[in-house]
């Protein structure tokens, strides 16, 4: 049975394992995410999300296969992006650091997690959804496009300590059209 729930302290080691598996896959050349082992994401990334009560995990049969951070925090580079929809900060929900264990790819866990994020946004009264990803991350960009997210701009930045990142910003409006 698949369930998405708030993360707990006992999930941190498993989330770190997923980060490490992604770093290993990137180093082997089987995926291109644009992350750097030891820089981002790290155990501290998951711990900070947990401490802020913003870490969510997807578990199937008791094993965590996906995780992400959901909050209202818009990174500074978002100010330079031409968002189609304007919303007050408290009406914008952002998904950060969505990860799926590479060994569980193809099971729909990424889609399920994004759908959960959308349901949470509706429950919180947030009509504007924003996500960012490295321009190198073609798999995430395909997933988000498939789920109805629109790429609104790309901004060069230092992303969590990684220089030279081209950050693709995406949005989806859940409110009524204006």
Region locations from a protein language model:
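A short beta-loop-alpha structural element at the N-terminal edge
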Residues: 3-17
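Conserved acyl-donor/pantetheine-binding loop and adjacent beta-alpha core of acyl/acetyltransferases
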Residues: 69-97, 102-105, 158-163
């Amino acid at each position: 049975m698949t369930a998405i729930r708030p993360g707990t302290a006992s999930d941190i080691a498993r989330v770190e394992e997923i980060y490490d598996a992604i770093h290993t896959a990137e180093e082997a050349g089987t995926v291109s995410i644009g992350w750097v082992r030891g820089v981002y994401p790290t155990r501290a990334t998951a711990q900070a999300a947990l401490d802020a009560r913003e870490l969510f995990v997807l578990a199937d049969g008791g094993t965590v296969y996906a995780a992400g951070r959901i909050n209202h925090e818009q990174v500074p580079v978002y100010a330079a992006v031409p968002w189609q929809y304007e919303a007050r900060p408290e009406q914008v929900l952002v998904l950060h650091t969505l990860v799926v264990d590479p060994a569980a790819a193809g099971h729909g866990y990424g889609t399920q997690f994004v759908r959960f994020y959308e349901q949470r946004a509706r429950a919180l009264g947030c009509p504007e959804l924003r996500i960012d990803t490295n321009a190198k991350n073609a798999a995430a960009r395909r997933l988000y496009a498939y789920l109805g997210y629109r790429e609104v701009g790309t901004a060069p930045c230092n992303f969590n300590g990684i220089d030279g990142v081209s950050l693709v910003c995406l949005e989806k409006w859940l409110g009524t059209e204006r």
